[in-house]
Swiss-Prot record:
The modification N6-acetyllysine is found at K21. Signal peptide: none annotated. This is Large ribosomal subunit protein P2. InterPro entries: P1/P2_N_sf, Ribosomal_P1/P2, Ribosomal_P2. One of its GO terms (cellular component) is cytosolic large ribosomal subunit.
Amino acid sequence: MRYVASYLLAALGGNTSPSAKDIKKXLDSVGIEADXDRLNKVISELNGKNIEDVIAQGIGKLASVPSGGAXAVAAAPGSXAPAAGSAPAAAEEKKEEKKEESEESDDDMGFGLFD
């Protein structure tokens, strides 16, 4: 992702076809070490393409990805009722999971940018 971001910054900054040297320079300026193989892969995939078209295609692909909330709602009607003995155990597990999530979410203020 860092290579794509650096490529996009260079392209949007006026460099129509950024080279590996351009991207490496941008990454080095923020203290990120560049992997030559990944860098060359990004350049070969994006070289000669219109950045606006690539962004539009990406937005179209993201629109087709289901969000996290819809899956839980869709699963609820199809699930069978659990046995009476297992319900308290399931409730305890859910409480424990919620506690763990709340501790983790404090680190990133409840929003995981790279999750």
